[in-house]
Curated annotation (Swiss-Prot):
Gene: Crygs
Origin species: Rattus norvegicus (Rat)
Recorded coiled-coil stretches: none
Family: Belongs to the beta/gamma-crystallin family.
Protein name: Gamma-crystallin S
Subunit structure: Monomer.
Gene Ontology process terms (BP): lens development in camera-type eye; morphogenesis of an epithelium; visual perception
Length: 178
C-alpha cells in the first residue's frame, strides 16, 4: 500500500476472479495489464476510474469497498483504462456555491450538504457555474446520484466545460467524505 494508504485492485472477471492489476498511484493506461475489468476492490482511499486511458471517457468515483461487477459502480461496460487517487481536502469542511448562469451570474445557492435532487431543493435542472469553497464534490448528470459523474476540487468553475461536462445538466451532487 502507498504512503497515503490508497490502493485499488482491478480484476478481469466478476467476483474478483481472473487476472488482477493492483495500483497504489495514478495510472494513465493500464490496458496492457487487463483487457477488461469486471470487478474492483478499493482497499484504501477514494479513486476516480476512467473508461479510457489518460483520464478520459466516463468517470466513476469509487470509495473504499468491493464492487463484484461493473454495474455496482454504475459502469456502462467492462472497459476501463486509467485511474487516479482522489485527494481529499483536510479539515472535513464542505461548502459549494452553484449558479443558474455561467460566469457566476444569475441566482446563487450555497450549501454544505449533499443534494439528491437540484430540482426539488433549488428548482434547477442545470448548473452553469459553481465555486467549490471547501471540500471535494461530485456532480451527477441525473437525480439520486446517477448518470455521468464529474469530480470537482476546490476552485472556481465558470462554465460546464471547466468541470469536464459537455452540457450544464447537473441534477444531483454530493461531498466526497472519507
Amino acid at each position: 500500500m502507498s504512503k497515503t494508504g490508497a490502493k485499488i485492485s482491478f480484476y478481469e472477471d466478476r467476483n474478483f476472479q481472473g487476472r488482477r492489476y493492483d495500483c497504489d498511484c495514478d495510472c494513465v493506461d493500464f490496458r496492457s495489464y487487463l483487457s477488461r475489468c469486471n470487478s474492483i476492490r478499493v482497499e484504501g482511499g477514494t479513486w476516480a476510474v476512467y473508461e479510457r486511458p489518460n483520464f478520459s471517457g466516463h468517470m466513476y468515483i469509487l470509495p473504499q469497498g468491493e464492487y463484484p461487477e461493473y454495474q455496482r459502480w454504475m459502469g456502462l461496460n467492462d472497459r476501463l483504462g486509467s485511474c487516479r487517487a482522489v485527494h481529499l481536502s483536510s479539515g472535513g469542511q464542505y461548502k459549494i456555491q452553484i449558479f443558474e448562469k455561467g460566469d457566476f451570474s444569475g441566482q446563487m445557492y450555497e450549501t454544505t450538504e449533499d443534494c439528491p435532487s437540484t430540482m426539488e431543493r433549488f428548482h434547477l435542472r442545470e448548473i452553469h457555474s459553481c465555486k467549490v469553497l471547501e471540500g471535494t464534490w461530485i456532480f451527477y448528470e441525473l437525480p439520486s446520484y446517477h448518470g455521468r459523474q464529474y469530480l470537482l476540487d476546490k476552485k472556481e468553475y465558470r462554465k460546464p466545460v471547466d468541470w469536464g461536462a459537455a452540457s450544464p445538466a447537473v441534477q444531483s451532487f454530493r461531498r466526497i467524505v472519507e
